[in-house]
């Protein structure tokens, strides 16, 4: 008698991940750990877990170190470029986007097309690329306004708020699920930065406005959606990283034009530019960048209406910035592609304390070198500790997901055996 008849899927078995099988082999019986075991044995046990985690994820840790080095150099070279040709932001932005487009398209046609499937090659992702470009442009424009009345310490804290903002939108849209340790780790990072920057804020007398602080925080929302769109494109369509960055750079050449009206806003201080002077500013910008000719040399400087030009050798500094920025974009895309938006968000937050420490070294910071501060190392420790807690939450979730998959497979096997008995 046939009561149930279900199409058999074969003897598919989910093989437990060898990483966690080996991890379990390191773990003694829970009661044995909880009992009065010698302290040395407990320490050895946890050291084995740390060794196992590093060994199995050595690639991502090396990638984090590489990203950190590139990101620090990117920010330092960006500051040097701003110091030399800060009066010509539109020229540097458009020139940089053009360089990125040429480099990414060249790399894609040389290397990317060989590994690109025919389906991807003929599929049009123009809408997704345009959306990413518009979100990036929107984020830059909003941040551009917010930064004008936001002090450096508050800027650093606001950047860390990308963690809870990304967690919220990834939970809402990408259906991410988090462990308690994820929330604890993220909170440790944000609170550490908040406390340190609050202390440092008393050392500065810079102009600050709560309204502009909120505007800067708002710029994190389109940035979060941009990163999530990248993740969807990578995971769903398996698109080539070089292709995405090439086309996005192409669109950004046009979306950067949206920035032009922003320069006429009166509260932009040194970078304020009357509409009638935009054409002259663009011409002088190219003269500064390509020919090294200074235009603004009088009635300029710290506290004045304009920054002074320092165009000699500006093209070298600018090319160095473009190189590290291109590397930054590639590594960012790779992290989002291979891991997730939240992994990138957590990793990117280390750049704050790392950049502060990098300014201790004159060969990196140049004239902007700073004296070491204990608070910078406190920030770095808080970030590392919070990241470890966050990673523990990910490990627990991954292992739980594998166990649930194994249980589902066992249940399906029992049902199949029952069906075979009933139908005999």
Swiss-Prot record:
A biological process from GO: amino acid transport
Gene Ontology CC: vacuolar membrane
InterPro entries: CRT-like, Transprt_Chloroquine
Membrane topology annotation: Multi-pass membrane protein
Vacuolar compartment spans: 79-89, 146-153, 201-208, 268-316, 367-376
Transmembrane regions listed in the UniProt entry: 58-78, 90-110, 125-145, 154-174, 180-200, 209-229, 247-267, 317-337, 346-366, 377-397
Membrane topology, Cytoplasmic segments: 1-57, 111-124, 175-179, 230-246, 338-345, 398-424
Main location: membrane
Record Pfam families: CRT-like (PF08627)
Purpose: Nutrient transporter. Involved in maintaining the osmotic homeostasis of the digestive vacuole.
Name of this protein: Putative chloroquine resistance transporter
Native organism: Plasmodium knowlesi
Lineage: Eukaryota, Sar, Alveolata, Apicomplexa, Aconoidasida
Gene: CRT
């Amino acid at each position: 008698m046939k009561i149930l008849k279900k199409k058999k899927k074969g003897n598919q078995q989910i093989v437990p991940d060898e990483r966690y099988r080996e991890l379990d082999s390191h773990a003694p019986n829970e009661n044995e750990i909880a009992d009065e075991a010698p302290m040395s044995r407990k320490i050895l046990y946890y050291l084995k877990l740390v060794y196992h985690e590093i060994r199995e994820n050595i690639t991502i840790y090396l990638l984090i170190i590489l990203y950190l080095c590139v990101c620090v150099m990117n920010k330092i070279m960006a500051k040097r470029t701003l110091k030399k040709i800060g009066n010509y932001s539109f020229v540097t932005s458009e020139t940089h986007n053009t360089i990125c487009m040429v480099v990414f398209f060249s790399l894609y046609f040389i290397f990317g097309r060989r590994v690109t499937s025919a389906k991807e090659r003929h599929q049009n992702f123009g809408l997704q690329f345009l959306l990413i470009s518009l979100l990036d442009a929107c984020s830059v424009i909003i941040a551009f306004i917010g930064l004008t009345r936001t002090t450096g310490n508050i800027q650093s804290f606001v950047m860390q708020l990308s963690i809870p903002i990304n967690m919220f939108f990834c939970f809402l849209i990408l259906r991410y699920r988090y462990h308690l340790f994820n929330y604890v780790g993220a909170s440790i990072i944000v609170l550490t930065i908040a406390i340190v920057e609050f202390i440092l804020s008393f050392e500065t007398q810079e102009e600050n406005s709560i309204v502009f602080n909120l505007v800067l925080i708002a710029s994190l929302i389109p940035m979060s959606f941009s990163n999530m769109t990248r993740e969807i494109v990578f995971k769903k369509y398996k698109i080539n990283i070089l292709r995405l960055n090439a086309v996005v750079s192409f669109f950004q050449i046009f979306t950067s034009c949206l920035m032009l009206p922003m320069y006429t806003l009166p509260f932009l201080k040194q970078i304020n530019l009357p509409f009638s002077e935009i054409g002259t500013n663009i011409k002088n910008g190219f003269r500064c960048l390509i020919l090294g000719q200074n235009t603004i040399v009088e009635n300029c400087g710290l506290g004045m209406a304009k920054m002074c030009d320092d165009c000699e050798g500006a093209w070298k500094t600018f090319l160095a910035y473009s190189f590290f920025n291109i590397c930054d974009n590639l590594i960012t895309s790779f992290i989002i592609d291979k891991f997730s938006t939240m992994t990138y968000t957590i990793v990117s937050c280390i750049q704050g304390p790392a950049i502060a420490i990098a300014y201790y070294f004159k060969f990196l910071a140049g004239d902007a070198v700073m004296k070491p501060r204990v608070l910078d190392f406190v920030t770095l420790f808080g970030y590392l500790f919070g990241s470890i807690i966050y990673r523990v939450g990910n490990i627990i979730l991954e292992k739980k997901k594998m166990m649930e998959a194994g249980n589902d497979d066992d249940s399906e096997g029992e049902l199949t055996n029952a069906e075979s008995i009933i139908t005999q």
